[in-house]
A protein has these predicted regions:
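Nucleic-acid nuclease catalytic cores
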Residues: 1-17
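An acidic intrinsically disordered interaction segment
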Residues: 39-61
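Short amphipathic alpha-helical segments and their helix-coil junctions
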Residues: 55-75, 151-153
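Class I SAM-dependent transferase core
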Residues: 64, 68-69, 167-192, 198-200
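Core catalytic lobe of class I
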Residues: 67, 77-97
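Structural motif
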Residues: 70-84, 142, 161-166
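Long recognition/docking surfaces used for binding and targeting
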Residues: 89, 93-178
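Conserved S-adenosyl-L-methionine
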Residues: 190-292
Length: 292
């Protein structure tokens, strides 16, 4: 249910007051049997698979995650958003990891799993992905185990990878616009101006695009979206999927570049590009006016 978090508890055993989290099970048992170890399994009948969501639900989920991380002032807003970016990075990496039908996702809370063990699994996933892609994050996940557990509970049932690209773009854009307007408003060009500028430039997939002060990556994202729409004109997604992807992905990886002087905003821009399916390796933290 929107805005609420459901918990299923196992009352077949007695748990002490400090052991309540190990009483949580993944889902209600089927036909009065034992509870499943995992709730979310890829494509298997009779159990849950993660699912795409609409814009409003995604915005609400992101806000709940950030409120959990911020904790009424435990972390500064930028630090909380940075931790959220790390966790979303783990979530996307797990969704895109190769797995057979019927295999469970790692990014979820297992039945009777203490916060410590869950946190160890999530941190291990993060470290393995960070090693493969050091361009994105260099720091460890810094939040405590209980907070990490709550954030995982908010995100575990969502399929971010298969959620519509426009939905993700609008949801994260609206969230960041409202969230950063106070401290970092200068880094966010209004999307109407960005859209007008990109439509006027009409970038092609074989041209280079560089934003020397890219902020959160708005110009880069709209340029990528423009080239994606060009791919729609040239190729049919159903019958020419490989050609369609190659058309815009080569542009994202080889022709799209951003420079941002603020390290925190650089991470936001990279996360933005990851959510929009790549191009993040070409965003660097540097003073774009240093050599001028």
């Amino acid at each position: 249910m929107a805005g609420k978090t459901r918990r299923f508890l196992d009352f077949t055993q007695k748990y002490g007051i400090l052991e309540r989290e190990t009483n949580i099970i993944a889902d209600l048992p089927r036909q009065y049997g034992r509870p499943e170890e995992f709730k979310y399994v890829k494509g298997a009948a009779g159990v849950f698979d993660i699912r795409p969501v609409e814009k409003d639900e995604l915005i609400l989920t992101i806000k709940k995650c950030h409120q959990t991380l911020w904790g009424g002032g435990k972390l500064s807003p930028p630090a909380a958003f940075g931790e959220l970016c790390k966790i979303i990075f783990v979530k996307l990496s797990d969704e895109n990891a190769p797995r057979k039908k019927g295999e469970p996702y790692e990014f979820q809370i297992k039945t009777h799993e203490p916060s410590r063990r869950l946190a160890e699994r999530i941190r291990s996933l993060y470290e393995s992905q960070k090693a493969r892609d050091p361009e994105v994050f260099s720091e460890t996940i810094k939040i405590d185990d209980a907070t990490l557990r709550t954030v995982v509970s908010h995100l575990e049932g969502i399929n971010l990878s298969k959620t519509d690209l426009d939905t993700k773009g609008v949801a994260f854009e609206q969230f960041m616009d409202g969230f950063f307007k106070g401290d970092f408003g200068q880094y966010f060009t209004p999307r109407e101006i960005i859209r007008f500028s990109v439509d006027m430039m009409q970038p092609k997939n074989d041209e280079l695009v560089l934003d020397p002060s890219c902020g959160s990556g708005g110009f880069l994202l709209y340029s990528l979206d423009h080239v994606r729409r060009l791919a729609d004109e040239f190729f049919d997604k159903e019958t020419e999927g490989a050609e369609h992807t190659k058309f815009w992905l080569n542009f994202a990886k080889g022709n799209l570049f951003g420079i941002e002087i603020n390290d925190e905003i650089t991470r936001v821009a990279k996360m933005n590009m990851i959510i929009h399916e790549d191009g993040h390796t070409n965003v660097i933290g540097f003073d774009g006016l240093d050599r001028i």
